[in-house]
Amino acid sequence: MEDYEQELCGVEDDFHNQFAAELEVLAELEGASTPSPSGVPLFTAGRPPRTFEEALARGDAASSPAPAASVGSSQGGARKRQVDADLQPAGSLPHAPRIKRPRLQVVKRLNFRSEEMEEPPPPDSSPTDITPPPSPEDLAELWGHGVSEAAADVGLTRASPAARNPVLRRPPILEDYVHVTSTEGVRAYLVLRADPMAPGVQGSLLHVPWRGGGQLDLLGVSLASLKKQVDGERRERLLQEAQKLSDTLHSLRSGEEEAAQPLGAPEEEPTDGQDASSHCLWVDEFAPRHYTELLSDDFTNRCLLKWLKLWDLVVFGHERPSRKPRPSVEPARVSKEATAPGKWKSHEQVLEEMLEAGLDPSQRPKQKVALLCGPPGLGKTTLAHVIARHAGYSVVEMNASDDRSPEVFRTRIEAATQMESVLGAGGKPNCLVIDEIDGAPVAAINVLLSILNRKGPQEVGPQGPAVPSGGGRRRRAEGGLLMRPIICICNDQFAPSLRQLKQQAFLLHFPPTLPSRLVQRLQEVSLRQGMRADPGVLAALCEKTDNDIRACINTLQFLYSRGQRELSVRDVQATRVGLKDQRRGLFSVWQEVFQLPRAQRRRVGQDPALPADTLLLGDGDAGSLTSASQRFYRVLHAAASAGEHEKVVQGLFDNFLRLRLRDSSLGAVCVALDWLAFDDLLAGAAHHSQSFQLLRYPPFLPVAFHVLFASSHTPRITFPSSQQEAQNRMSQMRNLIQTLVSGIAPATRSRATPQALLLDALCLLLDILAPKLRPVSTQLYSTREKQQLASLVGTMLAYSLTYRQERTPDGQYIYRLEPNVEELCRFPELPARKPLTYQTKQLIAREIEVEKMRRAEASARVENSPQVDGSPPGLEGLLGGIGEKGVHRPAPRNHEQRLEHIMRRAAREEQPEKDFFGRVVVRSTAVPSAGDTAPEQDSVERRMGTAVGRSEVWFRFNEGVSNAVRRSLYIRDLL
């Protein structure tokens, strides 16, 4: 050992202290130089080393010679080598080469996994701690039998320091072990050995340490394990491809069987070997196939089926079955309810009347299209498909949101309802289902309406619908008459594009699914898929998804794909699968703001005990939330999902003062008004300066109202109308001001702006327009009263004001100021000043009209007067008698100014007949007979026409049609 320790002088101290015992064992194993009896060399050319000794011996060729082992070796080591040489049979072990020096380089290249070993002992530890290798007798006792050939063959390689003492102070190199720590803190290592008496253990015991199963494994995984893993992956890949192929063949076969299957035949249940659920959605797999499997409302199902059956006469040629007469009691009751005053018919009664109504002249229903409306996920599309197949149609589905072009929309509708493809699979007529019709533009809806409004023949034969005999060229150009039913599906029936369609459609409101029926269906799905779920848990899932069938089934499939075979309430609360971003109604948002939630009605999706579900909008931090915090987040989410913030704020403003206020000092009202002002400031800043990042704060206004005014009482909420009324009144006031300003004289308008009139002048002007006048004739007025009346008339004409007579709903006549500037400057709640009497207003109105005519005649006289010597018009009074050319003519009358072009054609005076020389021709008149009255009539008409030119009364005939009350009036009565 001394020579051996001298040769290790170049090795680090920590390595020597850690592997001292192992290095000594390796040196003793390499020291056996006894030649093998067979004389076969240890290694063969070209063969890689397989054992630890071969790896050490292979390094001899490349290493330099080292001095032999020291003579002072222990006698125990020599005796061990002699026993090992005696135990080896002939030809079992090859002759090892002569040892030159310890192969430290080979030892360094080996992975002893030092990170798993204990810290090396201190250098001054006693060498007696090293456990010597076991003797051959110990090996024989260990295996329970004498030295056999196989045991002798493996004796040298299986020698281990733990053979004599299984408890080691250092981890073994070539064995699997476990470490144990005593109560005093001493670490010990135990070697793992298999049971030698068990079948198949000896082979594994011989090969595992040396074939990659022990600590000398370079890859970490044996080659056999790698091969087995690769084979398993290849086998799994082949199984998946075979499963896909079988699923494809199964789907094709099921489609053919469904097409060839007669109506109402039961479907075959899939076998257990077909794991179709792992490759398809459960929503499609468990979708209803028959009428009896539907979960929707029975009344809705029957109404849609009855409407489809109304097409049987046109599509199938089947006569409509006659209805059985109802008992005599029920019609009397219905008629009594219908004839009751103020009794409105229910929606069900209206639908029944529409279905019982007769057909149109073309033997089609009066409503050519059915419109299903309701929230998403309730099964509207499934209902349309099942009902159409149940009625004997082949369903053709199109999505209106995808085909938004009007031409494409028309082509798809005509191809499904009028072309040769009206016969679908199996010779069945088509039924067109248009999904998401609320997403179609107005132009596409107009195309659908034009197809629905095409008129057919008015005469129908007894054998069925009559075929147009002639004149069908224009109808064929339009596309022909609609002879197939169309079912439209929408989520929002109040979309602007559906206003015209709803008036002609058979409207069906899709109610929510009953929770009991939905829970039963979900339990059937979970049982068939091997998933355990309690009915209470499924009810919680239905409540979380608002009874959405699609969301519930998709949530179950998602949890099942994650390996959950048992569903609990905590899983339902923690998951967010199935939640949809759906816009809430305005009334539901206002109800959420003004009413406190019930204690037992706890939202499933907002459990405060879950750290990942404290808020629907984000993950949030862990911790519990109080009830006030939950209400805060719930109202905030409802306000953010409403989508119409202005309408929400208007509803809050119109309804918060109608609630039961608990604050007698109205402090909550003041705080609410401050929040409303803050919301207006945010909206103005966001839209005027385009600071749209401020729009994240307005949803907090409903939260503040909830904190201030929420109570347990059910609020009476009305739709907001104050904003619309204020806008209408504002536009009315602007029109009044514009009308007033446009009628003011230019001299007055130049000194009065609209704002100055509204704020300063109009209030005082109303006092000026209400003088104290006696309700008597103007001839009885004094000079002062006449001047006051003339000033009043002049002021009203300057501001274009007058009094108009109107009739009130009671039948009384009043005079109202026009334009009514009193509405601009006086509030309706304030007491009005003492108004003028009816006679006074009538007198003022008459004087205003007379003054208007006087001014109009004066202006017309000035305009029509001729110019004298180039002097401006209006100076004829000054220059009337001056000059030879000055001619003074009387001003034309009022009717002459308006009908001047007519007066030119009329004869003013009867001119005497003259001859060629200008002499008046005198004709002799014959005496008329007694019965001849025609000349007298002619003379009367001639005199009448002559008098028309001199008369002050004119009339004008207006062509057209009038429904007014008329009476015969002769011209002679006017003259």
From Swiss-Prot:
Q: What is its main location?
A: nucleus
Q: Cross-referenced Pfam families, in alphabetical order?
A: AAA
Q: Name one GO molecular function term.
A: ATP binding
Q: Which residues carry this modification: Phosphothreonine?
A: 51
Subunit info?
Answer: Component of the CTF18-RFC complex, which consists of CTF18, CTF8, DCC1, RFC2, RFC3, RFC4 and RFC5. During assembly of the CTF18-RFC complex, CTF18 may first assemble into a subcomplex with RFC2, RFC3, RFC4 and RFC5. CTF18 then interacts directly with CTF8, which in turn interacts with DCC1. The CTF18-RFC complex associates with PCNA and with DNA polymerase POLH. The CTF18-RFC complex does not interact with the Rad9/Rad1/Hus1 complex. CTF18 interacts with SMC1A and RAD21. Interacts with DDX11.
Record CDD domains = AAA, HLD_clamp_RFC
Q: What is this protein called?
A: Chromosome transmission fidelity protein 18 homolog
* Keywords attached to this entry: ATP-binding, Cell cycle, DNA replication, DNA-binding, Nucleotide-binding, Nucleus, Phosphoprotein
